[in-house]
UniProtKB/Swiss-Prot annotation:
It is an enzyme of class 1 (oxidoreductase). Binds 1 FMN per subunit. It holds the Pfam family Flavodoxin_2. The gene is azoR. Keywords: Flavoprotein, FMN, NAD, Oxidoreductase. Signal peptide: none annotated. This is FMN-dependent NADH:quinone oxidoreductase.
Amino acid sequence: MKILQINASARSAGANSTRLADTVTARLLARNPNAVVELRDLASHPHPVLDEPALGALFTPADQRTAEQSARVALDDALIAQVQSVDAIVLGVPMYNFGVPVQLKTWIDAIARAGVTFHYTEKGPEGLLKGKKVYVALARGGLYRDTPADSQVPYLKSVLGFLGMTDVEFIYAEGLAMGAESASKAFAEAEAQIEELIA
């Protein structure tokens, strides 16, 4: 088994979402001792955003790209290859202003490529990253689960499903900014959820 952990926090150390993702990965390793873990921290190793030069590179045929364009596409290729190679993905996701961190959106923009991780058929789009288990560890200061303010879960369900990753579990630690007692309770409940999911 090969596991990819993505830490999406803007903080490379001390992030609640990373703590939660670490707990998920540790539980997977406990149940799969021979598993291999690859870690990608999006704060300490930021990926370039999808801007006009990047779009130009992606839409230029490979044999016509400049050296600079080829280098830019290669950065995305590396992320795609990494995702293609793993069996399980653990995403550590904090909530920033009701959405996902820009670091995570940039990663998603990099791995979502027509003809590679999804394609269009006569019946519509089909995701090509099938057969992967995804755990999304959500850390939030307030209480947003199952409310209109939670834009993260619908978005992540949609985009991961679009890419073929439909076996997704969401793990919640909420109320982390609402006092020490609330935070302690949130982590305890999240850890119990992890133990139940990865039995």
